[in-house]
Design a protein with these regions (language model features):
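C-terminal transmembrane helix and the adjacent membrane-cytosol boundary/short C-terminal tail
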Residues: 63-77, 84, 141-220, 317, ...
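Conserved adenine-binding aromatic site and its adjacent loop/helix in ATP-hydrolyzing domains
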Residues: 125, 129, 252, 287, ...
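Membrane-water interface segments at the C-terminal ends of transmembrane alpha-helices
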Residues: 1-70, 85-109, 114-116, 140-159, ...
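Short hydrophobic, aromatic-rich alpha-helical segments embedded in or entering the lipid bilayer
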Residues: 27-28, 119-130, 263-277, 434-448
Length: 492
C-alpha cells in the first residue's frame, strides 16, 4: 500500500500519461471491448488531474485511517454494526486523513502541470508561470501568500469547528482522563467496556448486540459471511489502482517497439542502452545522487539535533516550535520553491549544488525530525541519568546509551531524506537550468516535449534505486537490532 510513496512522483505521473492518452492502454481496452467508438479525453483536463492526484495522495489518507482502526478492538466489528460502532470510533482518523489530503492537494504542482496542462490550471501553476516565465514577482508573491493563507484557514476552521487535526506525530502519548485518573490513549486499545475519549460504559458495547432474535442473527451471519469477499475485492482493486501503472511502465521499458506500446511485441534492452549511452542522462543522474547524498547528511544531522531539542527540552513553546519545524511538510511545495528561488537569486547561487542541496534540506529535515523524535520519545531518559550518576558526562552518556537505541530511526530518517531529494522536481525547476539539470528536471523536460520510451527505462531505474535504498535502510535496522541484542546478551 505504501510502496507508491517511495516511487518517484514523476514516474507515477508518466505512467498515468501513458495509460490515459488517446492511444493509451485505457482507451485501447475500452475500444476493444466495444464500449467506446472514439478515444475518450482522459488526460490534459480535470479528469486526468483527479485520477493522478487520487493515485498519489491515497496512501496519505490510508496512514491516519489505518492508525485509527488499529486502536479499535476487532471484537466490536464482529459483534456490532459498522455504522453504529466501528465508523464512529474511527471517524477522527478518517477526518484527519481527508484533511491531510485536502491540504496537500491545494498546492500540488507536478500532477496538474503534467496531466492537466492548459485544461486544468491551478494556483500552483499560476505561481510558477508568473515567477519563472513572466518574472512578475509581485503578483507571484501575492498568489503565494494567498495560497498559504488558504491552507492555514482550512486547518484553523477544521480544528475550530470540527475538532479535526492533522495526524499527530513525534511519538508523544495523548493522555485520556478516565474515572478521575489519567491513562495513556496510545497504550490501551478501545475495547468493549470503553468508549473513545475515556468514558466508561455500564456494560460492554458488544453485549446488547449479541442478544438478537434468531432471524436478525441469521441475517447478521449472512452479512458477515459475505463481508470478507467484498472487502477482498475492494482491497484488490485499490492495490491494482496503486501498483498497475508502475508495473506497466516497467514492462514497457523492456519493449522492442520504437514507440510506447502495450503489450510489448518483444523484449529488448534498447532503451536501457540508450540511457547508459547518453552522457546527458548519466550526468543528470550523477548530479542528483551528489545532491541527494549532501541533503541526506545535512538533513540527518539537523533533524536529529532538532528532535533531541524538541523531546528533551520541557518548555511551553516546544509544541509551537514543533509545528514550525514541520511546516515544510504541510506547506505547498511551490511556496518553498518560490522562497528559495528569491533567496538564492540575491545570493547568486541559482544553479549551484549548494543552493539545491540547501533547499532540499529544508524539505528533508522534517521527515528526520518526525522519525527520530518518535523513537527518542520512547527511550527512558533515566538510563542516561544512571550513566551520569556513574561519572559519565552528558555528551558521553547520550552517545553511549541513547544514540545506539535511536540509531535505527536515524537510519530511517536518512533514507527519507535521500529519497526526498533524489525525487524532488519542483525546486529543481526553479534552481536548475537546462544546461546542468538534475535527473527529475531532465525527466520533466523530456515528458514535456514527448513521451520517449527512454523515459520508461529511466523510470524503471529510479524505481529500482528506490527499492535498493529501502532495502539498505531495512538491512541497517536489522543489523542494529541484532548488534544490540548480542551486546545485551554478552553483558548478561
Amino acid at each position: 500500500m505504501l510502496f507508491p510513496l517511495w516511487t518517484s512522483l514523476l514516474v507515477r505521473s508518466y505512467a498515468w500519461m501513458v495509460l490515459l492518452q488517446r492511444t493509451g492502454i485505457v482507451n485501447q481496452v475500452l475500444g476493444d471491448l466495444g464500449l467506446i467508438a472514439a478515444p475518450l479525453p482522459l488526460v490534459y483536463n480535470e479528469l486526468g488531474v483527479v485520477i493522478g492526484m487520487t493515485h498519489v495522495l491515497l496512501p496519505f489518507a490510508v496512514l491516519p485511517i489505518y492508525a485509527g482502526m488499529r486502536q479499535v478492538d476487532p471484537a466490536l466489528l464482529r459483534a456490532g454494526h459498522f455504522f453504529r460502532v466501528f465508523l464512529p470510533l474511527t471517524a477522527p482518523g478518517v477526518a484527519a486523513g481527508a484533511l491531510l489530503v485536502f491540504v496537500l492537494a491545494m498546492g500540488y504542482f507536478v500532477i496538474p502541470a503534467l496531466l492537466g496542462g492548459r485544461g486544468a490550471i491551478t494556483i500552483a501553476m499560476l505561481i510558477e508561470r508568473q515567477i519563472t516565465m513572466l518574472l512578475n514577482w509581485g503578483f507571484g508573491s501575492a498568489l503565494s501568500v494567498l495560497l498559504i493563507a488558504s491552507v492555514l484557514l482550512v486547518l484553523g476552521l477544521a480544528t475550530w469547528l470540527a475538532g479535526v487535526r492533522l495526524p499527530e506525530v513525534g511519538g508523544r502519548s495523548r493522555p485520556v482522563a478516565t474515572g478521575g485518573q489519567v491513562e495513556d490513549a496510545d497504550e490501551k486499545p478501545l475495547d468493549g467496556t470503553r468508549w473513545q475519549g475515556g468514558a466508561r460504559l455500564e456494560q460492554p458495547v458488544a453485549a446488547p448486540m449479541l442478544r438478537r432474535r434468531p432471524g436478525r442473527a441469521r441475517r447478521r451471519w449472512l452479512r458477515c459471511a459475505a463481508g470478507p469477499a467484498w472487502l477482498g475485492i475492494a482491497a484488490g482493486a485499490v492495490y491494482v489502482f496503486l501498483l498497475a501503472p508502475i508495473a506497466l511502465v516497467v514492462a514497457m521499458s523492456f519493449s522492442s517497439s520504437q514507440y510506447l506500446r502495450f503489450p510489448p511485441p518483444g523484449l529488448s534492452l534498447q532503451w536501457f542502452r540508450a540511457y547508459f549511452g547518453s552522457a546527458e542522462w548519466i550526468d543528470a543522474t550523477l548530479l542528483s545522487l551528489e545532491i541527494a547524498v549532501v541533503t541526506m547528511i545535512a538533513g540527518t544531522v539537523l533533524g536529529t539535533l532538532g528532535a533531541i531539542g524538541l523531546v528533551r527540552v520541557r518548555h511551553w513553546s516546544t509544541r509551537a516550535l514543533y509545528g514550525v519545524l514541520l511546516s515544510p511538510m504541510i506547506a505547498p511545495q511551490i511556496i518553498t520553491a518560490t522562497a528559495c528561488y528569491a533567496l538564492f537569486v540575491k545570493l547568486r547561487l541559482v544553479g549551484s549544488v549548494v543552493a539545491i542541496a540547501a533547499a532540499h534540506t529544508v524539505l528533508a529535515t522534517p521527515f528526520v525530525i518526525v522519525t527520530v523524535s518518535s523513537a527518542l520519545a520512547q527511550v527512558d531518559e533515566r538510563l542516561e541519568w544512571a550513566a551520569r550518576g556513574l561519572g559519565m558526562g552528558p555528551l558521553r552518556a547520550f552517545v553511549s546509551i541513547t544514540a545506539p537505541l535511536i540509531m535505527p530511526a536515524i537510519a530511517s530518517g536518512a533514507v527519507f531524506a535521500f529519497i526526498t531529494s533524489f525525487d524532488e522536481v519542483v525546486i529543481a525547476l526553479f534552481l536548475t537550468g537546462t544546461a546542468h539539470p538534475t535527473l527529475p528536471r531532465k525527466m520533466w523536460d523530456a515528458v514535456a516535449m514527448q513521451l520517449d520510451p527512454t523515459l520508461a527505462a529511466v523510470s524503471t531505474i529510479m524505481v529500482a534505486m528506490s527499492v535498493l535504498v529501502l532495502l539498505i535502510g531495512q538491512a541497517s535496522r536489522v543489523w542494529f537490532d541484532r548488534y544490540h541484542t548480542a551486546a545485551r546478551s554478552d553483558a548478561v
